[in-house]
């Protein structure tokens, strides 16, 4: 029912194969979500042109596209990290992005969203954005929300007027979400996006 197409754009495999896979998924009536990385601008104009062409082709074949911009990720990555660690970090962001969406309709979720609602929110939604945050202690909800809203993945976008916001809260088994935390997060998101949004 749902297909995630994850690819690094700019090379032959991700740029060439991902639109074909996504097109097949759409033809099979699957909700099709692309989660892609685009390389740093230091990789040169020819590579970036290939990226732009690939993103455009893939965009036309999916319902929603999440873009992980490596230039923006540099704001949170230690420049002294090895390239192997940087790639592992970016891959981890891709994994968490897919998990965040898939867990919303998971049968293990405390508040489960019907798949029809997810489809309604994401079908033909175009470019989508994701913020990821975490927190511990008495201010964990506020800290996690602040991190998520300041995530480089959001790229300083203005989300007032957004139609849908999907919210996935994950807590430890012994420390479930409290009513106060739940209400704080949802009310804060309404203020951030405008009160016409569907959460």
Predicted regions and their residues:
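Tubulin/FtsZ superfamily GTPase core signature
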Residues: 1-199
